[in-house]
Structure formats: structure tokens, C-alpha cells
């Protein structure tokens, strides 16, 4: 069955509206979907497809047909992406807007349902009376109509549809540079959707989807319209999207996704060639602080706060110097800097002194994993090396952060790091902890601060006491409510420190005593391994030394002995000091020389590195520029080819459409014409068979009939109107005098009223004018005096202004004169310059013309000289030709004389001597193939053969008809005819051999006729003109020839037949 004919989009749209009008929306949606996905729709203009697509999107949203909409949108994108991107954006935006409107409507409907349920519940008067066993059972089985159930039934399906719409649109727009802006805006809308409706699962899927799109961008970078992450604008848009993703992840408290978003941002920042804005980086570090705080990674949390504070300082400096806009930088007022400095100090103080991880840090696998993780976090913060607790404090003190921090934080630092006293620590720190606990942001640091305080407490107690009561420790670790530390917390802290090897404390639960490690030979760790949550510091570096423990004394006795011996030698032996000082001076000199040399080498190496970096960057830039140029050219070529193809297809479609429209218009005109004519005889006839003549005749007949009908109607109507008009006038004549009298009375009354009103108004106006005149007459003297006084006062000012105006005019006149004079001078200079340039151009043209004339003259002289030389050569050639001709004439005369002598007295063949065959003026000619005689030789041969054959009749003397063939070799070897050389393959014929035998004295020499002589090869073409018969070889001679008697010789045919 053949496919159905393809319909136009306008007809499809009309049909869809008709189906919608009869409540057939699913059928309309199916019709539109089939039309869009049809292969024939690819050649339809986009302007006609756009309304179809908008209606399809609207119907698919109404009916929740997401898959149909997705299929149609993909097809529409493939059709329109190379011609019109705006229509794709319009359709996709419409799709998202309709889905969002449906979600909003569903939310409003759910609110209405819930409010009606609550109202119904509140209208019950007696709640106890309404509780029946049946209602209790029904409520138990079906459950209450709660808000969650209402949302699941009404809102959730539309939320799911909206989420699928976002996914569909993002998948359609991915990795297309022309649709990139809409892609980023849609991603932003999807983030807002997840944040507004708290869709955590969908947010994770959305992040993964965007991550996959970026990964596949490099894979399909060679495709047309692919995105280029090396483009700064594209990378900036991706960074903005990732920062929004990070913000939403933090708001939704999805810390794992937030950390992955941070890694994505760091990857994009490493690709970017332009630095990110400070406001974006401030947001980046601020979100990192929250992520690290939730993960209890206090070390990197403090490092992130330090980076945030440094960024605020840089932004404040840039804004103060005016090198950057305020909009590109975060808020960096004094309050913001104080807050950042406070949190830097507080977060650094919260870093644990010992490890708080439950895993053993001494294990190799855990150490390696920890190092890798710390390295990743260090790179995320943009730091050269991993941060430490001591390093953060040194950096904070060097930047005077304590002065910017809040006073209670400064006191807390002094108590914990400067003047730590275990017996009074809790009394001093309790008010500060209370203030910190009152602040919601600082309250999160109380628990790590307690861990730090307990660590300091146990480390210093271990230096003083060997055993201590647990109750005493509890009394020392008294914190304000609600931050009180219990015995269980202390025991847990001690067990964790012992497990990690950071503490050496034994607990006796029976007596409640804590015993510190007193083994003098125990090997305590000098530096403990840190964990991912903090960094352990050395005992000497972070804990105040109150007194040395016995184990420390035992471990340091050799060191102390060496120091005592060294001091003794230095005081007893003066030469020891001299040698030591001399060695130190020599070492200093060597170090100074080596430092200078190393400095120069470092500078040279730095210059080399910089030069190589510059060359590499230039090469990379050139390569990128070349790649971009090639890609641009390729894209332009593809676009031109695609545009040409589309233009050609559009042209063909337009021509076909116009032809169809002309045909339809013609058919409709014929149908309308026939319908207007109302011709009964043509109803059954095919319209296509009607020609213009027939239609014209039918039309003329119809017009004639209509004309006659109209004329008849006009005649009847005119006659009727004449009768009516005559009757009207007869009746009117009776009433005209009465009507005329009434009209005259009305006109006279109106005239009298108008006249009286006019006179009254004129009198009133005259009275008012007279009164005004009298009032003004009384004022005239005062007016005249005031005017004269005013003129007197203003005259001086007027004169002054007039003089100023005249001076200003004079100044302007002078300025204009000066300007005109300068203009004339400038024009004169320009005119002289132009004349000079014109004169130089004329002189240059004259020089060039003279040089050209000289070149032509020299060329003519050269041509004249060559012509004279050619003329001389031709003269020489003519002389040579004349001498040659003379020699030929002499040779011809000799040959003629010899022929006449031979014809008169025939004699035996005798070969000429070598001297006769070689002339001085004729070089030897080799008788090779193609070495034919010249035209002069042929003409001479013709003349000679003609002269010889003329006196002899053809029938009487057949032998004499071939004098040229019988001529001896001496006649054929003149000056113009070179002799034949005895070359390889050029053997003599039998005739030549016979003639040679006869000349050498053979017995049969006299019997050989002239015919036995070899023919002249050069005269072969003139054989037909020599008077010889065509087949004279078969004709017997006039005289019988005798056999030579030699065996194996040639016998002529006639001789063989005669025998």
C-alpha cells in the first residue's frame, strides 16, 4: 500500500485544531507527531513548522506525553539547527514554561484541597461523637488525607514531568555552541527547581548529567558547532553554572555533591586562561569552609578561611586603587574583614593537636590514602604545600590578624597558645565559650576547642604528675553549661589518644586514678602522625615545657654531656676557638662565593626557562590560532555548502509551490467563474478540458444575458419612478404656499431675537471698554515716568553691553580674518605642494617616456642590424645558389652530351672512375631510406629524360625510351647526386654485378643491353613520365638477348616463356 500523501503544515495545523474542537486532542497530538517525524518534513520551511511544533508541545504537556514531545523535539532540532536557532529556543522555552505552569497549578490545587479538608475537619462540632467503630476502622485502613498524600497524588506527577522536561531539553541542547546560552540558562532553571522543591535525588542526577556532558564535549570536539572549552566566554558560562551548582548543593546540604562540584570548578579553573572574578572565588572558598566544617576536616577548614581572608584583602586593595570594579569583588568592608579574621583564628585554634581518627595512622595503606587526599585538598585550595597548624598561626600573626579579630577570640588565642595554665584554664575560658556559644556560627567550634583544651591539659599534666585522680581531672575540665564534659567523654578521649600512640595514660577504674607513662626507657614519638581531620604537632613545638620528665632526661643525657664538653673545650683551649672561628670564616667565604655563583646560575636558568616558556606559549598560541583558523574555514565551507544546498532546495520547493499554486488558482478561478455563470450544461464536463476561448465565449454570452436583463429591469423601474414622482409633485403643489408662510414667520422671529442679543452684547462691551479707558488714563502719567526712569537706568547698561558686543564682534572678525589668512596660506602651501608633486610626476613621466623612447630606438637599431645581417646572409645564400645552379647547368650539359654520345654509339658499360663520382662542391650522399633527391635533381632528371625521349618514337625504339634507367653510374653521380656507399645491407643488384663482369672483360659483356643497368633509385617517382610502358619488364626487347652462360643467373619472364 503506498504511503499517504504528504500534507502541508498549514493543513495539518488546521486539521489538529478541528480535532481539538471536537474533543479529539489525543488524535490531534498523534497527527502532529507523525507530521513532525516524517522524512518529508525536513524540506518544509521552518516558519511553517514552528506553529505546528508549538501546538504539539502544548498538547503533549496537557496530556503528559513526555516521550512524544521528546521525539518530536529531537527531530525538530535536527531540522532547524542549521538554519534557524531562534525557533528551537522558542519551542524549548515554551515547553519548559508550560510544564512549570502545570506544576504551579497543581501546587495551588493541592493547597486548595488541603484547605478544604482542614475546613471540613474544623466544622465538626463533636469530635468524640463523630468517632465510630466504622470510621476508626476506615481511617486505620485508608490512612488520613494528609498533606504528603495530597502532594503525592496531585503535585508529584507534574514534578516528575517537569524534571523529565528539564532532562530532555538539556540533552537536546548539549555540546552545541549555537545553543550554549539556552543550555546554561536551562541548567540554572533546573537548579532552581531542585532547590525550590527540595529534590535531592534529582539534583544528584542533574549534576551527573552535566558532568557527563562536559566529558563528552572533548570527544565530539571535531563535530560542527561543537563547544570549545578553550573559549574564555564558554568556560566562563560553565564556571557560573558550576558555582550555582555548588550553591544549591550547600543549600540542600548534599556535602558529597558539593565537594564534587568544587572539584569540577577547580578543573575548569585550571583550563581557564583568564583568572576568575574575585567574587566567584570568594564564594568558592566560603563554600569550601562549610564543606570542610561538615566533614570535620578542621585543618583544611582553617586553610580555606585563610584563603578567603587573603582574597578579601586583595579585593579591598584593588577597589581602593581603582584597578577593579566593585561589582567584580566581594563585600570587603571592615566588618567583613573582622569577621573573616575572627573565623581564621578560631578555626586555626580548633585544629586538633593530636589525631582524632579511629584508624591507625601508622599503617602504610592509610598513610598513603591520607597523603593522596591531603594532596587533592591542597590543590583545591590552590596552595603549594599542605597546610599545618603552626604554619597557619605563623601566617595569621605575620598579617596581624589578631588585631582585626574580635576581642574574645584574641583572649582565647592568648589562653590556649601563649599562656596555657592547666589549673586555671577552665575558669579563664568559660566566659569566652559562653560568648562563642551564643553565636550560631561560632557554636560549631566548641567541640573541637574542647578536644584541643583536653589535649593541652593531659600533655602538661603528664610533665608534672605521675598519677592523678580522675575526679581532679574532671574538676580541671569544667566547662559552662550546656558544654559540660562528662567522665565518659574524658575516658573516650584518653582511649583514643592511647590507641593512636599520642598519649601514654593508664586508667584504674577501681581506684579512679590516671597513671602517666614513667618508663625512662620508653620511646615516645617526637612527632606524631596526623590524620585527615587535623595535624599532630611535636611536643616541644606546641606544648609549653614546664619541666623535663625522667624519660626525657635519660634520652637527652648524651646531648647534655656533649654540650658540657664543648663548652669546657671552648674555655680551656684558645686554639680551639681560633680554629673554629677560622673554619667558620672560611666556610662563610666559600658560602658567599658559592651563593653569588649559584645566584647567577639561577638567574641564567630563570632567563632560559622564561625564554623557553615564551617560545612554547608563542608556538602554542600560533598552533591554536592555526587550528582555529582551519576550523573556522572548515565551518565556513560547510556552512556555505549547506547554505547552497538549502538555497537550492528552497528554490526548487518554491518553484514547485508556485507552480502548484498557479494551477490551483487557475482551477479555482475556472470553478468560481462557472459557478457565477450558473451554467447547467457544463456541470458534468471536466474543468481541465475547458480552454480560454470556450470560457470567454461562455462569459460573453452570460454578460449579454445579464446586460439585457438589467436593461429591462431599469426600464421598468424608471417607468415606475416617473409615475411616482409625478404623483408626489401634484400633492406637493397643494401644500407649498402654507409651508412657505410658516417658514417666513419662523425666520423673522429668529432674526429679531438675534438682533436684540447682538445689540445688548455690544452695549455691555462698550461700557466695559469706556471704564477700562478711564482707569488706564489715570495710570498713564505714572507709566510714562516709570518708563522714562527705566530707560535712563538701562541706557548705561545697554551701552556697556553694546560696547562689549562690538568688541566681541571685532575679536571674532579678527579671529575669522586670521583664520581666513591662515586658510589661504595653508591652501597656497597645499596648492604649491600639489603643483610640485604634479611637476615631479610630469618630470618623472617625461623621464620614463624618454627612457622608453631610447629603449625603442635601441630596439629598432638592433632589429635593423639583425635585418642587415639577415640580408647579407641571404645575399651569400643567393650567390651560393647561383654557383650551385651554374654547376648544375654545367653538369646537365655534360650529362646531355654524354647521353647524346651514348645514344649515337652504344658501347659496353664501363664504371666511371672515383674522381668522376666525387666533385669538389658536392659532398658524398649516403643512399639511405628516405634520402630522396631534391627538387632540382628531379627537375633536371625530367628535363633530361624529356630531351632524350623526344626524337624517338615510342613504338619503334622501346629501349631508347628508358635512357635514364640505362644511364651509367657516372651520369648519376654528379655534384648534386652523391655516390652510393657500400654499406651493410646495401648489396649491388644482379644488373650491377653483370655490368661489372662485362667491364672486367667477361665474354658476354657485349651482349648485355642498356636495360641491364641498375635503375636510378632517386628517379623512381618520375618513372611514369619517362615514356616507358608500365609493365616493360615483361615486354621482350627489340633484339634477342643471348644468355650469359653463367649458372644460377636471373632469366627474364619472356625468355623463360620463349624457351
UniProtKB/Swiss-Prot annotation:
Basic and acidic residues: compositionally biased ranges: 794-902
Swiss-Prot/TrEMBL GO biological process terms: formation of cytoplasmic translation initiation complex; translation reinitiation
Description of how the protein assembles with itself and partners: Component of the eukaryotic translation initiation factor 3 (eIF-3) complex.
UniProt biased composition (Low complexity): 908-927, 942-958, 965-988, 1005-1024
Coiled coil, from the record: 99-130, 586-905
Highest taxon in the source lineage: Eukaryota
GO cellular component terms given for this protein: cytoplasmic stress granule; eukaryotic 43S preinitiation complex; eukaryotic 48S preinitiation complex; eukaryotic translation initiation factor 3 complex, eIF3e; eukaryotic translation initiation factor 3 complex, eIF3m; multi-eIF complex
Family: Belongs to the eIF-3 subunit A family.
Function: RNA-binding component of the eukaryotic translation initiation factor 3 (eIF-3) complex, which is involved in protein synthesis of a specialized repertoire of mRNAs and, together with other initiation factors, stimulates binding of mRNA and methionyl-tRNAi to the 40S ribosome. The eIF-3 complex specifically targets and initiates translation of a subset of mRNAs involved in cell proliferation.
Pfam family, one: eIF3a_PCI_TPR-like
HAMAP family linked to this entry: eIF3a
GO molecular function: mRNA binding; translation initiation factor activity
Region (Disordered): 794-1059
Keyword terms: Coiled coil, Cytoplasm, Initiation factor, Protein biosynthesis, RNA-binding
Protein name: Eukaryotic translation initiation factor 3 subunit A
PROSITE patterns per record: PCI
Location in or out of the cell: Cytoplasm
Major localization class: cytoplasm
Amino acid at each position: 500500500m503506498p504511503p499517504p500523501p504528504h500534507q502541508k503544515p498549514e493543513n495539518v495545523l488546521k486539521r489538529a485544531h478541528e480535532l481539538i474542537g471536537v474533543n479529539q486532542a489525543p488524535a490531534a497530538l498523534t497527527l502532529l507527531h507523525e507530521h513532525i517525524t516524517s522524512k518529508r518534513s525536513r524540506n518544509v520551511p521552518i516558519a511553517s513548522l514552528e506553529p505546528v511544533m508549538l501546538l504539539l508541545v502544548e498538547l503533549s504537556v496537557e496530556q503528559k506525553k513526555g516521550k512524544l514531545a521528546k521525539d518530536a523535539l529531537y527531530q525538530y532540532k535536527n531540522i532547524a539547527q542549521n538554519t534557524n536557532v531562534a525557533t528551537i529556543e522558542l519551542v524549548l522555552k515554551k515547553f519548559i514554561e508550560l510544564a512549570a505552569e502545570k506544576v504551579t497549578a497543581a501546587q495551588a490545587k493541592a493547597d486548595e484541597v488541603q484547605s478544604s479538608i482542614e475546613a471540613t475537619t474544623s466544622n465538626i462540632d463533636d469530635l468524640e461523637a463523630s468517632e465510630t467503630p466504622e470510621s476508626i476502622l476506615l481511617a486505620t485502613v485508608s490512612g488520613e488525607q494528609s498533606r504528603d498524600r495530597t502532594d503525592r497524588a496531585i503535585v508529584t506527577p507534574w514534578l516528575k514531568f517537569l524534571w523529565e522536561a528539564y532532562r530532555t531539553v538539556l540533552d537536546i541542547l548539549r555540546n552545541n555552541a549555537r545553543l550554549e546560552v539556552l543550555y546554561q540558562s536551562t541548567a540554572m532553571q533546573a537548579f532552581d527547581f531542585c532547590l525550590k522543591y527540595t529534590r535531592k535525588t534529582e539534583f544528584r542526577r542533574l549534576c551527573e548529567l552535566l558532568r557527563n556532558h562536559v566529558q563528552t564535549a572533548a570527544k565530539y570536539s571535531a563535530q560542527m558547532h561543537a563547544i570549545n572549552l578553550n573559549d574564555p566566554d564558554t568556560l566562563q558560562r560553565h564556571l557560573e553554572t558550576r558555582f550555582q551548582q555548588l550553591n544549591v548543593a550547600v543549600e540542600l546540604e548534599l556535602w558529597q555533591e558539593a565537594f564534587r562540584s568544587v572539584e569540577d570548578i577547580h578543573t575548569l579553573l585550571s583550563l581557564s586562561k583568564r583568572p576568575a572574578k574575585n567574587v566567584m572565588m570568594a564564594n568558592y572558598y566560603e563554600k569550601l569552609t562549610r564543606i570542610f566544617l561538615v566533614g570535620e576536616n578542621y585543618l583544611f577548614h582553617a586553610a580555606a578561611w585563610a584563603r578567603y581572608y587573603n582574597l578579601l584583602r586583595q579585593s579591598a586593595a584593588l577597589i581602593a586603587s581603582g584597578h577593579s570594579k566593585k561589582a567584580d569583588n566581594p563585600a570587603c568592608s571592615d566588618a567583613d574583614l573582622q569577621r573573616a579574621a575572627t573565623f581564621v583564628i578560631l578555626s586555626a585554634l580548633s585544629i586538633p593537636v593530636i589525631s582524632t581518627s579511629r584508624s591507625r595512622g601508622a599503617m602504610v595503606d592509610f598513610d598513603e590514602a591520607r597523603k593522596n587526599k591531603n594532596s587533592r585538598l591542597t590543590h583545591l585550595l590552590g596552595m603549594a604545600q599542605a597546610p599545618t597548624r603552626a604554619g597557619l598561626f605563623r601566617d595569621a600573626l605575620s598579617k596581624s590578624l589578631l588585631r582585626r579579630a574580635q576581642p574574645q577570640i584574641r583572649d582565647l588565642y592568648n589562653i590556649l597558645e601563649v599562656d596555657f595554665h592547666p589549673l586555671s584554664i577552665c575558669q579563664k575560658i568559660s566566659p569566652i565559650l559562653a560568648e562563642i556559644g551564643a553565636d550560631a556560627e561560632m557554636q560549631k567550634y566548641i567541640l573541637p576547642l574542647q578536644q584541643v583544651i583536653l589535649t593541652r591539659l593531659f600533655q602538661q599534666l603528664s610533665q608534672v604528675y605521675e598519677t592523678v585522680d580522675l575526679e581532679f581531672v574532671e574538676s580541671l575540665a569544667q566547662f559552662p553549661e550546656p558544654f559540660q564534659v562528662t567522665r565518659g567523654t574524658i575516658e573516650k578521649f584518653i582511649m583514643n589518644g592511647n590507641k593512636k600512640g599520642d598519649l601514654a595514660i593508664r586508667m584504674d577504674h577501681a581506684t579512679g586514678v590516671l597513671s602517666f607513662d614513667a618508663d625512662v626507657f620508653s620511646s615516645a614519638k617526637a612527632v606524631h602522625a596526623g590524620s585527615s581531620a587535623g595535624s599532630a604537632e611535636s611536643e616541644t613545638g606546641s606544648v609549653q615545657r614546664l619541666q623535663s620528665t625522667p624519660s626525657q632526661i635519660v634520652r637527652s643525657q648524651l646531648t647534655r654531656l656533649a654540650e658540657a664538653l664543648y663548652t669546657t673545650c671552648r674555655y680551656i683551649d684558645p686554639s680551639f676557638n681560633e680554629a673554629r672561628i677560622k673554619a667558620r670564616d672560611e666556610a662563610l667565604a666559600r658560602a658567599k662565593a658559592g651563593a653569588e655563583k649559584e645566584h647567577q646560575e639561577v638567574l641564567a636558568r630563570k632567563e632560559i626557562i622564561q625564554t623557553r616558556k615564551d617560545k612554547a606559549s608563542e608556538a602554542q598560541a600560533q598552533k591554536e590560532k592555526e587550528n582555529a583558523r582551519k576550523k573556522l574555514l572548515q565551518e565556513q565551507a560547510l556552512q556555505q555548502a549547506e547554505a547552497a544546498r538549502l538555497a537550492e532546495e528552497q528554490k526548487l520547493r518554491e518553484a514547485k509551490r508556485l507552480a502548484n499554486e498557479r494551477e490551483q488558482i487557475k482551477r479555482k478561478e475556472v470553478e468560481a467563474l462557472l459557478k457565477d455563470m450558473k451554467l447547467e450544461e457544463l456541470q458534468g464536463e471536466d474543468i481541465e478540458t475547458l480552454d480560454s476561448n470556450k470560457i470567454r465565449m461562455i462569459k460573453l454570452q452570460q454578460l449579454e444575458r445579464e446586460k439585457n436583463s438589467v436593461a429591462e429591469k431599469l426600464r421598468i423601474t424608471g417607468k415606475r419612478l416617473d409615475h411616482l414622482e409625478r404623483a408626489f409633485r401634484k400633492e406637493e403643489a397643494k401644500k407649498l404656499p402654507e409651508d412657505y408662510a410658516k417658514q417666513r414667520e419662523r425666520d423673522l422671529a429668529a432674526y429679531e431675537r438675534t438682533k436684540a442679543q447682538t445689540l445688548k452684547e455690544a452695549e455691555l462691551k462698550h461700557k466695559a471698554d469706556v471704564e477700562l479707558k478711564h482707569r488706564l488714563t489715570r495710570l498713564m502719567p505714572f507709566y510714562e515716568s516709570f518708563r522714562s526712569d527705566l530707560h535712563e537706568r538701562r541706557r548705561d547698561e545697554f551701552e556697556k553691553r553694546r560696547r562689549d558686543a562690538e568688541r566681541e564682534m571685532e575679536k571674532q572678525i579678527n579671529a575669522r580674518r586670521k583664520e581666513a589668512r591662515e586658510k589661504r596660506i595653508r591652501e597656497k602651501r597645499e596648492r604649491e605642494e600639489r603643483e610640485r608633486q604634479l611637476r615631479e610626476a610630469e618630470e618623472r613621466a617625461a623621464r620614463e617616456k624618454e627612457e622608453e623612447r631610447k629603449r625603442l630606438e635601441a630596439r629598432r637599431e638592433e632589429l635593423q642590424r639583425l635585418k642587415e645581417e639577415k640580408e647579407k646572409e641571404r645575399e651569400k645564400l643567393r650567390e651560393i645558389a647561383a654557383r650551385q645552379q651554374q654547376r648544375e647547368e654545367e653538369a646537365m650539359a655534360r650529362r646531355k652530351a654524354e647521353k647524346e654520345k651514348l645514344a649515337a654509339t652504344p658501347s659496353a658499360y664501363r664504371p666511371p672512375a672515383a674522381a668522376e663520382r666525387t666533385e669538389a662542391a658536392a659532398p658524398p650522399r649516403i643512399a639511405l631510406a628516405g634520402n630522396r633527391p631534391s627538387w632540382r635533381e628531379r627537375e633536371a632528371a625530367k628535363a633530361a629524360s624529356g630531351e632524350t625521349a623526344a626524337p624517338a618514337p615510342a613504338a619503334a625504339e622501346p629501349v631508347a625510351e628508358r635512357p635514364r634507367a640505362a644511364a651509367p653510374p657516372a651520369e648519376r653521380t654528379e655534384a648534386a647526386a652523391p655516390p652510393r656507399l657500400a654499406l651493410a645491407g646495401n648489396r649491388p643488384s644482379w644488373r650491377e654485378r653483370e655490368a661489372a663482369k662485362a667491364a672486367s672483360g667477361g665474354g658476354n659483356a657485349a651482349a648485355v643491353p642498356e636495360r641491364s643497368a641498375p635503375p636510378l633509385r632517386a628517379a623512381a617517382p618520375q618513372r611514369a613520365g619517362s615514356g616507358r610502358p608500365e609493365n616493360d619488364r615483361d615486354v621482350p626487347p627489340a633484339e634477342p638477348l643471348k644468355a650469359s652462360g653463367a649458372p644460377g643467373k636471373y632469366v627474364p619472364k619472356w625468355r623463360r616463356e620463349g624457351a
